[in-house]
């Protein structure tokens, strides 16, 4: 059975800035008002025969959104971006451009870029880990869509081990 959350209507949103390093137009700091759609597919389980209680999955997704909200999102695993942390300031460099920003205004994610595609993978992995930590073992897959606005987004499906 499938459970579905529409991020636009469920309030699963965050506003962040990012840079797609090397891209001709998106390679400058710019922002989006993102919303996150989530689908879970799995077996019904527990006393109430839920795939997952809506309150639980909404709380998980909202927590991740809140971690990214009003931050500059940067890719920790980009092979050509160099980072240095000094005195509560993050310095970073890509090609001939150098930046500095207070560390509390930035979040470094373990992804190679900050595209909607890589953010979808990040969200799916985070949701999977958090559900696993809560003891969920009945979910076959998680699908996450990261929407940069109405009508454009990227979707990723992560398959899980069911026990």
UniProtKB/Swiss-Prot annotation:
Give the first-level EC class, as a single word: lyase
**What pathway is this protein said to act in by its record?**
Purine metabolism; 7-cyano-7-deazaguanine biosynthesis
Enzymatic reactions: 7,8-dihydroneopterin 3'-triphosphate + H2O = 6-carboxy-5,6,7,8-tetrahydropterin + triphosphate + acetaldehyde + 2 H(+)
Give GO MF terms, alphabetically. 6-carboxytetrahydropterin synthase activity; metal ion binding
What residue stretch is flagged as signal peptide? none
Q: Does the keyword tRNA processing apply?
A: no
Active-site annotation: 26, 70, 148
EC numbers on record: 4.1.2.50
Cofactor binding, note field: Binds 1 zinc ion per subunit.
**What are the binding positions for Zn(2+) in this chain?**
18, 30, 32
- Tell me its cofactors: Zn(2+)
Q: Which UniProt keywords apply?
A: Lyase, Metal-binding, Zinc
Q: Which domain of life is it from?
A: Archaea
What InterPro entries is this protein classified in? 6-PTP_synth/QueD (IPR007115), 6-PTP_synth/QueD_sf (IPR038418)
Q: Per the database entry, which stretches of residues form a coiled coil?
A: none
Q: What does this protein do?
A: Catalyzes the conversion of 7,8-dihydroneopterin triphosphate (H2NTP) to 6-carboxy-5,6,7,8-tetrahydropterin (CPH4) and acetaldehyde.
Q: Which family does it belong to?
A: Belongs to the PTPS family. QueD subfamily.
Mention any additional remark: The active site is at the interface between 2 subunits. The proton acceptor Cys is on one subunit, and the charge relay system is on the other subunit.
Q: What is this protein called?
A: Putative 6-carboxy-5,6,7,8-tetrahydropterin synthase
Recorded source organism is: Methanocaldococcus jannaschii (strain ATCC 43067 / DSM 2661 / JAL-1 / JCM 10045 / NBRC 100440)
């Amino acid at each position: 059975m499938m459970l579905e959350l529409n991020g636009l209507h469920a309030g699963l949103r965050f506003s962040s800035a990012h840079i797609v390093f090397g891209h001709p137009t998106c390679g400058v700091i710019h922002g989006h008002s993102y919303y996150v759609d989530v689908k879970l597919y799995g077996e019904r389980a527990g006393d109430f025969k839920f795939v997952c209680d809506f309150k639980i999955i909404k709380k998980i997704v909202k927590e991740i959104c809140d971690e990214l909200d009003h931050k500059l999102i940067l890719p920790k695993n980009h092979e050509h971006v160099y980072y240095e942390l000094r005195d509560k300031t993050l310095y970073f460099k890509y090609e001939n451009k150098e930046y500095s920003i207070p560390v509390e205004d930035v979040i470094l994610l373990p992804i190679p870029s900050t595209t909607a595609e890589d953010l979808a993978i990040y969200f799916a992995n985070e949701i999977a880990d958090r559900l696993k930590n809560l003891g969920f073992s009945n979910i076959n897959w998680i699908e996450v869509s990261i929407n940069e606005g109405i009508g454009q987004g990227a979707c990723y499906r992560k398959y899980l081990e069911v026990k």
